[in-house]
Amino acid sequence: MSRVAKAPVVIPAGVEVKLNGQVISIKGKNGELTRTVHSAVEVKQEENTLTFAPREGAVDGWAQAGTTRALLNAMVIGVTEGFTKKLQLVGVGYRAAVKGNVVNLALGFSHPVDHELPAGITAECPTQTEIVLKGADKQVIGQVAADLRAYRRPEPYKGKGVRYADEVVRTKEAKKK
């Protein structure tokens, strides 16, 4: 049995939750997020909480209920507070700039790299070597950050590349003669 699924999700004031069969819509000050719940999970709304339980006869019911609870809790946090992800560019000549919904990266290639941001995600560059992504959907922010990092992953000898702000890059020792 999932311990995560047993804890209810508290709905704060100013957040509106709509249950429509297996589709849940959560609306707050940062926008609206919608998710389809797995068929093995039953979601009930009681006043200002959401509770989760497996449907009768579902083999993976508790596992899916725990996953659903974690995803919906992230949605509630996203529409109230939002999520941020910070990236750093390490390397000589590595720069980032934001123009509208496009992040422009200079990463040592012969051409600049332009990455278009999906709807609901904003980016800003406090310095030329930092990118801050903000948005309500935790999953989309993580995917955009991973896409930006994939253009030039940190290499293990000098540590140059795009890295998460809290990432520790283990460097290798150079070959000895």
From Swiss-Prot:
**Keywords linked to the UniProt accession:** Ribonucleoprotein, Ribosomal protein, RNA-binding, rRNA-binding
Name recorded for this polypeptide: Large ribosomal subunit protein uL6
GO biological process assignments = cytoplasmic translation
What family name appears in the similarity comment?
A: Belongs to the universal ribosomal protein uL6 family.
Protein purpose = This protein binds to the 23S rRNA, and is important in its secondary structure. It is located near the subunit interface in the base of the L7/L12 stalk, and near the tRNA binding site of the peptidyltransferase center.
CC terms in the record's Gene Ontology section: cytosolic large ribosomal subunit
* Keyword field contains DNA damage: no
Gene3D superfamilies assigned: Ribosomal protein L6, alpha-beta domain
Q: Which organism is it from?
A: Yersinia enterocolitica serotype O:8 / biotype 1B (strain NCTC 13174 / 8081)
- Describe the subunit structure: Part of the 50S ribosomal subunit.
Q: Which domain of life is it from?
A: Bacteria
- Has keyword Ribosomal protein? yes
| Gene Ontology molecular function terms on file | rRNA binding; structural constituent of ribosome
Q: Which Pfam families match?
A: Ribosomal_L6 (PF00347)
PANTHER family for this protein: 60S/50S RIBOSOMAL PROTEIN L6/L9 (PTHR11655), LARGE RIBOSOMAL SUBUNIT PROTEIN UL6M (PTHR11655:SF14)
